[in-house]
Amino acid sequence: MGEKMQFTELDQYLFGQGTHYDIYKKLGAHPTTQHRKKGVYFAVWAPNARYVSVIGDFNNWDNQANPMNRVGEIGVYEIFVPGAKVGDLYKFFIVGYHGEELYKADPYANEAELRPGTASRITDITDYKWKDTTWMKKRPEFDEKREPMAIYEVHPGSWKKHPAENEDDPGFYNYREFAHELAAYVKEMGYTHVELMGIAEHPFDGSWGYQVTGYYAPTSRYGTAQDFKYMVDYLHRNKIGVILDWVPAHFPKDAHGLANFDGTAVYEHEDRRQGEHPGGGTKIYNYGRPEVKNFLIANALYWIEECHVDGLRVDAVASMLYLDYGKKDGEWVANKYGDNKNLEAIEFFKHLNTVVLGRNHGTVMIAEESTAWPQVTGKAEDNGLGFSLKWNMGWMNDFLEYMKLDPYFRKGDHNKMTFSMTYAYSERYVLVISHDEVVHLKCSMLNKMPGYPDDKFKNLKAAYAFMIFHPGKKLLFMGQDFGQLREWSEERELDWYLLKEDNHKDLQNFVKTLFHMYKKYPALYAGDNDPEGFEWINADDADRSIFSLVRKSPTKRNNLLFVVNYTPVERPDYRVGVPKKKQYKLIMDEHGLLDKPKVFKAEAQECDHREFSFAYPLPAYGIAVFTY
């Protein structure tokens, strides 16, 4: 590469501090020109390596052709290779600390070879011309605390598939064609965001993308890095936000990956009790090492700033917070205070969220955290973790347990539907029905419901209606909005043919109506984090398994009264207490929106500990939405 050193002393200093937030512009492979020669600048961090070279299509994979130069004490190796070009495959050949020969994919690669290949591919991340200027200019104004979020969770490889040309053809859609079909569906259904699973490169389809080897590379299953950017771009131009699953909790042991990168524990802890999950499946990052923190934080920024992604859903946060997560005595090491809190991971989250959200207003960081860890969405300066939102796993578990019950036994578990309101304002929550709930013999949402087929559809409508009216953002996994019967499998597409059947099409239309109503009425989202925005009318009608509640708009206009009946018993003269002596317009029932609202006048008759009430016929599995 001549005398020109690209990884400067400032780069070394910032990387060593863990604060080189655009490190991905230096490490990795970057097409450039030096001494009037076109080529590629390569740089890799391998602090304990004895020898490093870059090998690839450009040098016939000769591990002696392009030895790299070590830069300073931090352990970065760099080289400029004339003639290397976009599209070439490459790896780093490393002679490790103990003399072993290692062939590693580039941790900072922006594109990868299609599996089962494990090489990295040279690409130019500056080469895409974005057209989402309107979205990106408005993005800083987005405030998840006061705006609707209806998230459609999608696994791109199994949403839809092309007919296979042969037994080895998985039938994947390219990112570009996927974008067009997905945008049309999401807009029609009323979702505001998509949350995409399995985007970062991973070797094994069956991991669903949760065992990542290419953190900076959109998986090549669906196309190139440019194709991925087009997908984000197109979704933005259709006013759809994009959230990615992000997996900083662990990484796999694959030989080409991060594990034992230079013959030593570079990215993971050296002590297996700290650096490995039980059973030997995956490695745990060393969150206390500045260069490792830098790798992860810069990766979050890469997706958000370079790829225009609007947020990250951070996987398995609980496994990072607890040193003994999933471990037995003797399998973990206590912190300096003698307890099980992972102090380095806690500081990592505070640092991550402060930097990402501080630099990118209008984006969201969402924690999948399954315990009662306090202040997950609290401010980092107040000793919180600094996330924007947290998945509400407690609500989900109680809600699903209740809905699975035979209606005649629901009265015994009535509190499962009300308990969540005792902690609803302790965090900023997303109500989730995710992929995890429709796999591993847990049944699809429709088949969780009790009764005959007609009963299942009625129960599921009532379930989704309650979800919309409960405080919190919403997330629904693909297929559950039209009543997918089979459990989800990454190997096949959704059973779209079911939409030819009336029950499934009717359910889909009902869910569509719910989400469009959710976006239309600020009462359903603007007060999610304000106790004044919600009021139970009757949370105690266990004998009849009926719930009634009010969602209030900050403007005091277009408040909503919601009543739902979770039994097949009709209540022809059901009386509900109301907050005020006003007219209440029935705008939606279990069939959908009414063509013409029905008006009910409150009268001076005490009910539900309120001075005023009115009566109306509540059908079996009935749903009623009134405005006032």
Predicted regions and their residues:
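Carbohydrate-interacting/catalytic domains
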Residues: 1-148, 176-186, 190, 411, ...
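Short, flexible loop/turn elements at secondary-structure junctions
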Residues: 46-48, 72, 83, 155-160, ...
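Short glycine-biased active-site loop of nucleotidyltransferases that positions the nucleotide triphosphate
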Residues: 69, 204-209, 253-260, 377, ...
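Short catalytic/ligand-binding loop motif for oxyanion handling, primarily in non-cytosolic enzymes
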Residues: 101-102, 160-162, 202-205, 250-253, ...
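Substrate-binding/active-site clefts of carbohydrate-active enzymes
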Residues: 113, 133-146, 155-341, 610, ...
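Soluble or luminal CAZymes and related metallo-dependent hydrolases
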Residues: 174-178, 227, 291-296, 341-348, ...
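A short acidic, glycine-rich active-site loop
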Residues: 217-221, 336-343, 452-454, 498-505
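Conserved alpha/beta catalytic core and glycan-binding cleft of carbohydrate-active enzymes
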Residues: 308-310, 328-490, 519-529, 533-576, ...
